[in-house]
Swiss-Prot record:
Carbohydrate attachment residues: 131, 170
Name of the featured protein: C-type lectin domain family 6 member A
Alphabetical UniProt keywords: Adaptive immunity, Calcium, Cell membrane, Disulfide bond, Glycoprotein, Immunity, Innate immunity, Lectin, Membrane, Metal-binding, Signal-anchor, Transmembrane, Transmembrane helix
Short name of one Pfam family: Lectin_C
Annotated organism of origin: Homo sapiens (Human)
GO biological process: one example: positive regulation of intracellular signal transduction
Length: 209
C-alpha cells in the first residue's frame, strides 16, 4: 500500500506547487496592471495640466531645474536652467542691451515677460542678482505720458508697491521704467526714454509638478 500512495503524494505536491505558482503569477500580473494604470493616471494628471506649457517651453529651453518646495502640493517648482527662483516665479537677468519694446519681445520669445514687482521682498531678491553698473528695464510703462503707469501683465499699479527714486518719475517723455543703483540711496526705479538701450529682467511663472 505504501508504494501505491507515494506517487499520489508526489502528484498532489506537484499540483499544489503548480497552483501556488499560478496564483503568484496572477498576482504579479494584477499588480503590474495596477502599476501601469497608476502610471497612466499619474501621467495624465501631471502632464494633462502642465503638458501644454511644457511643450511650449521646450522650444525655448533645453532643460529645467526643479526645487523641492516642502509640504506644498504640488511639491516641485521648476524653472529653466540658469534662471533664478523666487516665490512662484522664475527670473532671467539679460545682459543684452535693447530698447524697451525689444527687451519685452526677447522675454516673450522665452515664454516670459518683463519683470513685474509685487512686493518689496521680491525686488530685494532681484537686486542681489544685478550689477550696480547697469540699469535694467522693468515691465512698467506710461504709454500716454500722463503719469498713468501700467504693468505689462495688467497687474494693478499699487501705491504701496512703488520704489521710485526720490523725485521720480519726472518727465512725460520718459515713458518706460528701469531699476538703477544710485549712491547713496541704492536701488530704485527711474523713468527713462523707451528707445534707450538697457539690460532687462524677464519673469515667468514656475512650472509645478
Amino acid at each position: 500500500m505504501m508504494q501505491e500512495q507515494q506517487p499520489q503524494s508526489t502528484e498532489k505536491r506537484g499540483w499544489l506547487s503548480l497552483r501556488l505558482w499560478s496564483v503568484a503569477g496572477i498576482s504579479i500580473a494584477l499588480l503590474s496592471a495596477c502599476f501601469i494604470v497608476s502610471c497612466v493616471v499619474t501621467y495624465h494628471f501631471t502632464y494633462g495640466e502642465t503638458g501644454k506649457r511644457l511643450s511650449e517651453l521646450h522650444s525655448y529651453h533645453s532643460s529645467l531645474t526643479c526645487f523641492s518646495e516642502g509640504t506644498k502640493v504640488p511639491a516641485w517648482g521648476c524653472c529653466p536652467a540658469s534662471w533664478k527662483s523666487f516665490g512662484s516665479s522664475c527670473y532671467f537677468i539679460s545682459s543684452e542691451e535693447k530698447v524697451w519694446s525689444k527687451s519685452e519681445q526677447n522675454c516673450v520669445e522665452m515664454g516670459a515677460h518683463l519683470v513685474v514687482f509685487n512686493t518689496e521682498a521680491e525686488q530685494n531678491f532681484i537686486v542681489q542678482q544685478l550689477n550696480e553698473s547697469f540699469s535694467y528695464f522693468l515691465g512698467l510703462s506710461d504709454p500716454q505720458g500722463n503719469n498713468n503707469w501700467q504693468w505689462i501683465d495688467k497687474t494693478p499699479y499699487e501705491k504701496n508697491v512703488r520704489f521710485w527714486h526720490l523725485g521720480e518719475p519726472n518727465h512725460s517723455a520718459e515713458q518706460c521704467a528701469s531699476i538703477v543703483f544710485w549712491k547713496p540711496t541704492g536701488w530704485g526705479w527711474n523713468d527713462v526714454i523707451c528707445e534707450t538701450r538697457r539690460n532687462s529682467i524677464c519673469e515667468m511663472n514656475k512650472i509645478y509638478l
